[in-house]
UniProtKB/Swiss-Prot annotation:
GO MF terms, alphabetically ordered: ATP binding; serine-tRNA ligase activity
Protein name, UniProt field: Serine--tRNA ligase
Organism per entry: Haemophilus influenzae (strain PittGG)
GO cellular component, one term: cytoplasm
Broad class of the protein's primary localization: cytoplasm
Length: 429
């Protein structure tokens, strides 16, 4: 949620930025009308409350003098009814303003390039050189099936499309990748490992911005009797970031760096017909997520650090990748600046997204009321939150299988993974 003071004091400027940079049309007339109503009702309730307090004192004085206070009590009751009605109207207006505010995307940072879609993203760097093969390249589906380690038919039988079963050495490599990532982030990058629920409530989803706008992208549970409804997490960013919801953090404890390995569940609404073959776009996939809670003055610096942590995974696996700064038209709803890392996928002869690292500024913190303050200081201020994939495990498996394949269909195990696989150096044939 963007700063409400910006909407009150710089509405026209904010609306223009949202139109140009986000292709988002803010209904300024409606918002202005609601703001006028809010101000009027605020004054009305404050005046009624002040008058009611004054009348209450007058009743006390009249009673002490032995006067008949029945007429005064009747006036108080009437004033109380007026106050209750005015407060209800004010609450309704505030709720409507809040619903509009929840639908507004974050404002991009000034350095984010203007653009309509991913064709206008800005490439920052490339690392590594794509391998030249002297044999016909197989895709990860063929490699995995030939190794008897990927079974999409079983996934479809058990559940449906966009699900897979992994077995044997492929399943072991998938697990090894996640363990390697967690160890790297906790032992070298300073993150605290967390284990979090895979089901979250709606307040949690509002906190990080999935609701109310992206409800169709989630898998929702039916509420049991006496229970609130839940949704499966689309990313560990949701529960991990919400650990600081409604918390006032001592500034001395910042930055807070947390990581988690979880399955992620996405409906992939709007992705019909895209990446229907293989592990690239699944309803269920594993990801190691990194989250940072930082001082507002240090969030851009933290974004560079966090992105570097994701890059380190790719570098240690010796997987060629490129780093891309997303343009305004390709950014996520809550982000003010995002880098994507795209790994080389030989069978597709292109780079594919494997990590997205974002500075959310105070957008999520305002929704969550996640604040910090210096020791001895009474005033609090919102923290900044960042998140990034470090990495998507299934897509990393895709990249390893295809980049490390051999002519006989076997796959060489990257050196950094061998300790996690009992010293195994080749899988497959």
């Amino acid at each position: 949620m963007i700063d409400p003071n910006l909407l009150r004091n710089n509405l026209a400027e904010v609306a223009e930025k949202l139109k140009v940079k986000r292709n988002f049309m803010l209904d300024t007339e409606k918002l202005t009308a609601l703001e006028d109503q809010r101000k009027n009702l605020q004054v009305t309730t404050e005046n009624l409350q002040a008058e009611r307090n004054a009348r209450s004192k007058a009743i006390g004085a009249a009673k002490a003098r032995g006067e008949d206070i029945a007429p005064l009590l009747a006036e108080m009751d009437d004033m109380g009814n007026q106050l209750t009605e005015a407060k209800a109207q004010l609450d309704a207006v505030l709720a409507e303003i809040n619903q509009i505010a929840l639908s507004i995307p974050n404002l991009p940072a000034d350095e984010v390039p203007l653009g309509k879609d991913d064709t206008e993203n800005k490439e920052i760097l490339r690392w590594g050189t794509p391998r030249t093969f002297d044999f016909e390249v197989k895709d990860h589906v063929t490699l995995g099936e030939e190794a008897n380690g990927l079974d999409f038919a079983a996934g479809a039988k058990l559940t449906g499309a966009r699900f897979a079963v992994m077995k044997g050495q492929i399943a072991k490599m998938h697990r090894a990748l996640a363990q390697f990532m967690l160890d790297l982030h906790t032992e070298q990058h300073g993150y605290l490992e967390t284990y979090v629920p895979y089901l979250v409530n709606h307040a949690t989803l509002y906190g990080t911005g999935q609701l109310p706008k992206f409800g169709e992208d989630l898998f929702h549970t039916l509420a049991l009797q006496g229970e609130q409804p839940y949704a499966l997490i689309p990313t560990a960013e949701v529960p991990v970031t919400n650990l600081v919801r409604d918390v006032i953090i001592d500034e001395a404890e910042l930055p807070i760096k947390m990581t988690a390995h979880t399955p992620c569940f996405r409906s992939e609404a709007g992705s019909y017909g895209r990446d229907t073959r293989g592990l690239i776009r699944m309803h269920q996939f594993d990801k190691v997520e990194m989250v940072q809670i930082v001082d507002p003055d240090k969030s851009m610096e933290a974004l560079e650090e966090l992105t570097g942590h994701a890059e380190k995974v790719l570098q240690l696996l010796n997987l060629p990748y490129r780093k891309v700064l997303l343009c305004t038209g390709d950014m996520g709803f809550g982000s003010c600046k995002t880098y994507d890392l795209e790994v080389w996928v030989p069978a597709q002869n292109t780079y594919r997204e494997i990590s997205s690292c974002s500075n959310m500024w105070d957008f999520q913190a305002r929704r969550m009321q996640a604040r910090c303050k210096a020791k001895g200081d009474k005033k609090t201020h919102l923290v900044h939150t960042l998140n990034g994939s470090g990495l998507a495990v299934g897509r990393t498996l895709v990249a390893v299988l295809e980049n490390y394949q051999n002519a006989d269909g076997s796959i060489t195990v990257p050196e950094v993974l061998r300790p996690y696989m009992g010293g195994l150096d080749v899988i497959g044939k």
